[in-house]
């Protein structure tokens, strides 16, 4: 068995540092863009309703076309696919900024540009995670996935704060320009990454290959199990995002409550990053199912009764515990999905799976929004139950004897 390597040794892998830097800039830009788009709509149109629809336009179209994006990723190769996303994002965000400065930013124009931005998104999100197992040797994949997950956690903390600060200081148009510059910087960093060819055949139509990709995810026991377990797990976080502000509002004034909620989610992000880095040393390969199951079980306990029944202190401890568990869960999930997927289909599988996983978050938030008027405690119980169900679904995933599809 090959031994694991240290995080410092990862810097010797050609192209990995440039890829992670590009991923950081790209994800930071994406995280900032959504909030800045909302603030842009409020500043220019004074319409919370339009802000909601613009957020929808910036996210949902990309989820819908993710199967086609995954096929394109497999055909042209992950390096080119990610570069397409970064260049397209730079262009569309710059266009929104220019439209604002030139007075052309009507709702239809901004909505159209937000939709175009969304369509390229799956290429970058799935492409980066398709590149990793092709750049990194198997014995270093745990650490690489851990760093990748930690980047997400850091961006979740820094992105919204930077977006709000830049809009307040420079205005939404200037903030959009800086976000576009970050996307351009990501594209420059990616130029240092080896161009890897596509592994899928380009002779079959994109639509037929996309349908085949969906069929693979549904039919392959590991991918099907991960889709179910991760969707349920994301329902937990969707419910928490609704209930936490309401819980805090019952203990603090409106002004103080907003600050407290921001600090709580910052702590969750930091805990997730630390948990991911520690998970990189666990050697999760072959033990992913057990690590995910244990993490989800702890998350359920942290959600209820710890966060729900022991006041604000219990809420803080519960969220920190759930955040710390999210790191190992994500690292193990990534490693298992990469190991159990045919490399020729990894791009479309990643793209489809990520979209399916994300669907659990708004579903959990929507259910919480309906139930929250009746009982706060019921939302925490719901969040705990979905994590328990996620753990059960994870245990249903076959062990390593199952061959790759």
From Swiss-Prot:
GO molecular function: transmembrane transporter activity
Cysteines engaged in disulfide bonds, as pairs: none
Transmembrane segments: 32-52, 53-73, 84-104, 108-128, 150-170, 171-191, 237-257, 260-280, 291-311, 314-334, 352-372, 378-398
Localization: Cell membrane
Protein topology in the membrane: Multi-pass membrane protein
PROSITE patterns in the record: MFS (PS50850)
Family annotation (InterPro entries): MFS, MFS_dom, MFS_trans_sf
4Fe-4S as UniProt keyword: no
Sorted UniProt keywords: Cell membrane, Membrane, Plasmid, Transmembrane, Transmembrane helix
Predominant location category: membrane
The UniProt record lists the keyword Transmembrane: yes
GO CC term (a single one): plasma membrane
Family affiliation: Belongs to the major facilitator superfamily.
Protein name: Uncharacterized MFS-type transporter y4rN
